[in-house]
Every structure is written in structure tokens, then in C-alpha cells.
């Protein structure tokens, strides 16, 4: 594998060109009106889930245990599952974007958004790990394995789906 811009004496340091690129990307991300409008729309219309016309909509999954029951996910020392997990996650996401969130909470919320992207019990990811790096640099397909959470095994099981719907206050048919 060839990494021509990595300095062996200081591998975490970026080259001047990389620094410039990161500065431009950071500026674009922080000042993008379009991104801000998209985030505002998401936060205004449900954030982590939405219920409309007796349908529950969400991005990826509801973390489940092996037996199909709702999985407890610990956030800052407290356990949440199902609807409570989605509500707490949405609240934390909003804390990251609210101007009046205290600094310590805001920093946690920003870190939590990163976790939502690739975390094991994240309702937006729900896999045991992310193997993007492995897929790019390791030829062995065994290194590419991402085990999906139990929701993906049960998402066609009417009994389990009805239990999830019930936990959100939505009646299955």
C-alpha cells in the first residue's frame, strides 16, 4: 500500500495541501445553506422516526436482542430502547444543532452523531462494525464482514414487527 503524503516521523500531520483541503471542506460544511436547510427540514419532520397514516418510518433499524425483544442501549449511563431510544437519540441530535446547548452537552452530542453513523447499537447503522477501510486496503473478503443487527433477521417476522409497532403506539394490520 502506497501513502506518499504520510510523514513517517509525524504520521498524524497533514501536508500543506491536505491542510488546505481540510480547511476548505470544514468551511463548506459549516457555511452550507443547503446543508442547513436539509438538517432543519429533518429536525422539523421527525428527526429519527416519523409516524404518518399508521406507518412508522425510520432510516435503518430498531436495535433488537437475539430473541427479537427491544434491545437496551446505554446512553450516558441510562438505558433506552424502542421509542424511548429514538426519542433520546433525536433529542441528542437536536442538542448538537441548538445554539443554546451547554458546551459539554453539545460536544457529547456532536460525538454522538459520529457514533450514529457507525456505532454498533446505532439505530442508523446497527451493524457490528464498519469495514470501509478493510474493503479498500485488504483483499481478503473475510475482513470485509459487517454483521447486521437482529432487526434485519426479524424485519419480515409479523409478530416482531407488530411488537415494534405497538411500542411506537402504531397498530399493525
Residue ranges and their predicted role:
Residues 1-173:
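Feature recognizes metal-dependent phosphohydrolase scaffolds
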Amino acid at each position: 500500500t502506497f501513502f506518499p503524503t504520510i510523514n513517517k516521523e509525524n504520521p498524524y500531520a497533514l501536508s500543506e495541501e491536505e491542510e488546505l483541503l481540510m480547511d476548505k471542506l470544514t468551511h463548506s460544511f459549516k457555511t452550507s445553506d443547503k446543508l442547513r436547510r436539509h438538517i432543519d427540514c429533518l429536525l422539523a419532520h421527525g428527526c429519527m422516526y416519523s409516524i404518518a397514516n399508521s406507518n412508522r418510518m425510520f432510516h435503518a433499524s430498531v436495535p433488537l436482542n437475539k430473541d427479537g425483544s427491544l434491545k437496551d442501549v446505554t446512553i450516558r449511563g441510562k438505558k433506552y430502547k424502542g421509542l424511548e431510544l429514538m426519542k433520546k437519540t433525536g433529542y441528542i441530535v437536536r442538542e448538537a444543532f441548538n445554539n443554546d446547548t451547554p458546551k459539554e452537552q453539545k460536544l457529547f452530542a456532536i460525538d454522538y452523531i459520529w457514533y450514529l453513523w457507525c456505532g454498533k447499537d446505532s439505530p442508523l447503522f446497527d451493524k457490528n462494525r464498519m469495514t470501509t477501510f478493510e474493503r479498500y486496503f485488504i483483499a481478503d473478503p473475510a475482513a470485509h464482514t459487517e454483521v447486521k443487527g437482529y432487526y434485519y433477521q426479524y424485519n419480515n417476522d409479523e409478530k416482531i414487527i407488530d411488537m415494534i409497532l405497538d411500542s411506537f403506539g402504531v397498530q399493525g394490520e
